[in-house]
Amino acid sequence: MKRRYWLLASVAIMLSGPALAAALPPGEVDLFRAVEQDRANSVKKSLAAGVNPNARDLGGETALIVAIRNDANDAATVLMDQKGIDLEAKAPNGNTALMMAAYRKNQPLVIDLLRRGAKVNQSGWTALHYAAAGGSAEITNLLLDHKAQIDAESPSGMTPLMMAAREGQEDAVKVLLARGANATLKDGGFHLTAAGFALKADKPWIAKAIDAHLAAKGIKPQ
């Protein structure tokens, strides 16, 4: 029985590649393969052959978002250089290229996207949420330098400070507090402050740092 299971699983794996390839035009299949493998010259060839730089894979992600998700910086640069590239195209989950770069803590691409004019703010989840949750103080500062809304709220009312606190990202918490994040806000689901999320996630040292910040400003911790 076990041997039969593994045989069926192996067949499924072998068939998945051709099945996926058949669902996209050949040119787009070549583009996404090149993007995932960071083969910049092959990406250029696909685009020169007329493949849409904003093409989407079977999961609905654009080639640029796929490149960033795979840390394929060379491929991403080729795509961003294309006339008509949509830097603001969203994946089905709402992610943009900048959000993915922040999530991957890919500072060079974050810098490049910002230089090219990628939007920092939007309703709901933002790149700053992802940078804070990932703990990158550098990217958090970069986004704030480009006017990121420091207390941006996710659909459930989560702020970047809450995300950083919940994930135990002390450096990001320090940056956000130093730059004016409101530590008294509560989310709309659990009705917790950033310190409350830190405690809920068993990160008491983060909660202590936030409470000390509030106390220094004469605000009673909640």
PLM regions: where:
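N-terminal signal peptide c-region/cleavage motif recognized by signal peptidases
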Residues: S16-P18
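Ankyrin repeat structural motif
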Residues: R39-L47, A72-D81, N106-L114, S136-D145, ...
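Ankyrin-repeat-protein effector appendages
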Residues: K2, L20-D30, H146, R179, ...
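Ankyrin repeat A-helix N-terminal signature
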Residues: R33-D38, V66-A72, M100-N106, Y130-S136, ...
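Intrinsically disordered, low-complexity regulatory segments in ankyrin-centric signaling systems
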Residues: R4-Y5, L20-A49, L58-E61, T77, ...
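Ankyrin-repeat boundary/"N-cap" motif
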Residues: L24-R33, R56-T62, K90-T96, N121-A127, ...
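N-terminal export leaders
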Residues: R3-A12
